[in-house]
Every structure is written in structure tokens, then in C-alpha cells.
């Protein structure tokens, strides 16, 4: 894959609610020239139907080849996006999904790599930080070419919540959620700003917002998935658009800074896990992490979040099957 290639090809693995919403976002936004959709054999006809349905929108958007794909179609793809996995049920945490989804992930990654794929993996199935790690292990790919959606959606939720609280456009809010995409994530309050004005200073000039309100706002962001799952069964629109944004950054070689699940090599005192932090991303994957200078409390939260993920990974990798399949 090179940044000068004009025909951009994406393979989507998993045509459930998230996958099909992502495909729809790609069509709406005119991203990529080719989209192949892979499903398990018993759901292949659904992928055929979705490809046909999506193709009927092309006269209103831009040309794109859309079809139900096989793993062999991954060989010349620029990007393989993995959304396939067991869904999160009411009452389940993302980490509860580990056992079911690691086995699914191993099967997918093995078949993609066997096709001769040389592009970039983008992982969205949950628990995303753990499955990004397993994709790296099972693929043998360089860490830069394995990316998780990380806290991209959480950060978008955070910005939207702050925007509503402050009555400003969310696009003018610059604030990140870091750590696990899940219960141990945290808000980087120390660097939240509105158009360059530190949040604390901005609040002084606008209105009297109590600390308790900000804590409640963050908790609403952290628990948003549970709220949505309890009301409609699943979340898919927000993450689909987040994935489309990451896809555009990769295919257009933007060198955009986005909060992603990124491999840690000592930043924040954390190593050997993929976890949510801002990073520069372009045509060759992760260019470099952007290491926000966290305060002491935030650094401790980052380390605690990573420790939880590491414990899950260590337990999972006691499975000899996963050990044998590891290439990194």
C-alpha cells in the first residue's frame, strides 16, 4: 500500500449493525473506491443484499464498487476493518466479551493474513483494546499497521456533552478521553479547551458550572453505551462515523490526530498494551503517538486502566491455542 495509490480498497469483516452502518457512512461520505463485505457463510446472502442495497445509493453520492467478498479479496486491500464479534448484551461489560471474541478474532486475522494482505488493520470489535492487541499478535504485523478505534467515540461523546453544556459547536471543543474504551477510561480535564481557551478559564467567563456537574457529565459519557444498549439493544451509528473518520484519515494520508488504540512503549509508564490515546495517523498507519502531558492524577488513571487490560491479556494468553498462534 502506498499513499499515492488512487484506487482505495476497503474490506469490511462483519456485516452486523456496526458493520453495515459503517458501510453506509462510507457510501454517504464518498470514502474509498471499492468496498468488499465479508460475512460468515450462513450470513453471506445478507452481505449480498447489503451490497446491492448500498449500491442503489451511489447515483446520489459517488462511484464505488460494492460486493460481498471472500477472504481472498483482502490480498490487495488498503484497509481491513474488523467489526465482527459477539455483541455486548445488557448488563455485560466490554471485557465480558473477551473469551467469545478472541476466538473469532483469531479466525478472522489468520484468514486475512493468509490472503497476502499487506495493508492496515482497523479493529472495532469489543473489547477493542484487547482485540487490537490480539490482531497484532495473530497477524505478526508491525504495531503501526494495527489500529483500534480506541477512545475515538468516547472522545466524540465527551466533546458533544461539553458542547451541549456550554452551548457551543462540538467542533470547537478540543477534549480527549484516554485509557481503555470501557469502564476504566478517564477524561483529560487538564487539557480540555474551547477554541484554545482552557476549559477552566472558559467556564469563568461564561457560567458557573459546578464540579459535580462535570463529574456527572463524564459519567454520562463513560456509561453512554450501557444507556443506549438498555434502550435500543446496541450502539452503531456513532462508532460507524468514527470508523469512517479514521478510514478517511488513512486513505487520504491526512496525518490527522485522532484518539485511537495505540501500542504503548513506555509512555505514561505503560508498556505492551494497546490503549486509547491521541496519535498521528496516515497512509502507513500510526505515524507517532501524541503524548499529552498528563497531570499526576491522570497518569495514575492511565496506568490503572492499562493494568486492567494487561490482566485480561495475561489471563487470555494462558490459552495454548492463542500462544501458538502468536507471531509478535
Swiss-Prot record:
Keywords: Allosteric enzyme, Cytoplasm, NAD, Oxidoreductase, Phosphoprotein, Virulence. Disruption phenotype: No change in total NAD(H) pool, but a 57.4% increase in the NAD+/NADH ratio. Reduces the ATP pool by 54.5%, and extends lag phase during growth. Significantly reduces maximal heat flow. In competition with the wild-type strain, reduces nasopharyngeal colonization in mice. Reduces production of the pore-forming toxin pneumolysin. Increases susceptibility to various antibiotics, with widely varying mechanisms of action, including erythromycin, gentamicin, chloramphenicol, rifampicin, penicillin and vancomycin. The keyword Transferase does not apply. NCBIfam families: L-LDH-NAD, PRK00066.1. Belongs to the LDH/MDH superfamily. LDH family. It comes from the Bacteria. Allosterically activated by fructose 1,6-bisphosphate (FBP). It catalyses: (S)-lactate + NAD(+) = pyruvate + NADH + H(+). It comes from Streptococcus pneumoniae serotype 4 (strain ATCC BAA-334 / TIGR4). The keyword Cytoplasm applies. GO terms for cellular component: cytoplasm. One of its GO terms (biological process) is lactate metabolic process. This is L-lactate dehydrogenase.
Amino acid at each position: 500500500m502506498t499513499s499515492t495509490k488512487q484506487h482505495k480498497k476497503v474490506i469490511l469483516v462483519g456485516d452486523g449493525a456496526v458493520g453495515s452502518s459503517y458501510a453506509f457512512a462510507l457510501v454517504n461520505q464518498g470514502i474509498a473506491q471499492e468496498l468488499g463485505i465479508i460475512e460468515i457463510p450462513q450470513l453471506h446472502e445478507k452481505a449480498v443484499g447489503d451490497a446491492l442495497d448500498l449500491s442503489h445509493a451511489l447515483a446520489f453520492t459517488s462511484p464505488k464498487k460494492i460486493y460481498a467478498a471472500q477472504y481472498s479479496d483482502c490480498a490487495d486491500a488498503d484497509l481491513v476493518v474488523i467489526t465482527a464479534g459477539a455483541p455486548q448484551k445488557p448488563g455485560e461489560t466490554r471485557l465480558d466479551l473477551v473469551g467469545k471474541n478472541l476466538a473469532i478474532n483469531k479466525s478472522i486475522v489468520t484468514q486475512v493474513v493468509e490472503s497476502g494482505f499487506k495493508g492496515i488493520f482497523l479493529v472495532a470489535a469489543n473489547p477493542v483494546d484487547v482485540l487490537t492487541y490480539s490482531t497484532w499478535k495473530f497477524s505478526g504485523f508491525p504495531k503501526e499497521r494495527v489500529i483500534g478505534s480506541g477512545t475515538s467515540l468516547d472522545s466524540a461523546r465527551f466533546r458533544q456533552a461539553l458542547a451541549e453544556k456550554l452551548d457551543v459547536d462540538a467542533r470547537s471543543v478540543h477534549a480527549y478521553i484516554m485509557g481503555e474504551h470501557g469502564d476504566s477510561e478517564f477524561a483529560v480535564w487538564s487539557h480540555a479547551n474551547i477554541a484554545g481557551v482552557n476549559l477552566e478559564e472558559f467556564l469563568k467567563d461564561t457560567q458557573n458550572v459546578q464540579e459535580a456537574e462535570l463529574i456527572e457529565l463524564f459519567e454520562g459519557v463513560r456509561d453512554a453505551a450501557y444507556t443506549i444498549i438498555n434502550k435500543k439493544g446496541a450502539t452503531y451509528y456513532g462508532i460507524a462515523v468514527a470508523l469512517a473518520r479514521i478510514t478517511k484519515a488513512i486513505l487520504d494520508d491526512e496525518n490527522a490526530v485522532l484518539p485511537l488504540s495505540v501500542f504503548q512503549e513506555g509512555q505514561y509508564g505503560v508498556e505492551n498494551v494497546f490503549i486509547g490515546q491521541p496519535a498521528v495517523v496516515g497512509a502507513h498507519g500510526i505515524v507517532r503517538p501524541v503524548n499529552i502531558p498528563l497531570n499526576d492524577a491522570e497518569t495514575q488513571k492511565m496506568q490503572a486502566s492499562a493494568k486492567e487490560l494487561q490482566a485480561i491479556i495475561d489471563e487470555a494468553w494462558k490459552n495454548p491455542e492463542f500462544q501458538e498462534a502468536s507471531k509478535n
